[in-house]
Amino acid sequence: WQSTRKITWNWQSLGDLQPYMLNFLENHDEQRFASDFFGKDAGNVFAALYASLYFNRASFMIYSGQEVGERGMYQEGFSGKDGRSTIFDWYTSDKVRKLWRYIHGDMKALDRKDVALLERYRSALTQATGNRAVISGSTYDLCYCNLSSDGFCVDRHFAFLRDCGDDTVLVACNFSNVDAEMEL
């Protein structure tokens, strides 16, 4: 992982363009989060998901199968076993086929781990689309004022507020692989 300081740098460099950008964690050019080449486990995605989904008003994209932990570890078409999922080789992964069956009533198509991941994605998206602060609120990066706060690691933690009138949401993202308690 890179330092979470780059998140602050990124939004500051985008300035007024930020609401017009597309936020995403995966696409056909990038290695899948759950692949052996990147995050190795789809369950490690949530700090990145919450930061990408809740930080600003830009649109957010979930790429095919991401919500059930598609790993992209197939050697299909013109692509090697590279942790990516091609869109050009008319290929559908097992996870995407199982997700389709699950959505269409085959409740045994996905295993429990995939269902839990799907439900967590669903919950995050439902919260984001149902909260006025997330939909249209202002964003306040809290990292600069927590550089010396107890438990806050400036290279592994990212915290921000979304605020709109009486609705305020505090989001604290832990990008490390150990649990953390932080004072903000």
Model-inferred region functions:
Residues 1, 183-184:
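Helix N-cap / beta->alpha transition motif
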Residues 6, 15-27, 32-183:
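Loop/helix patches that line or flank the sugar-binding groove of alpha-linked glycan CAZymes
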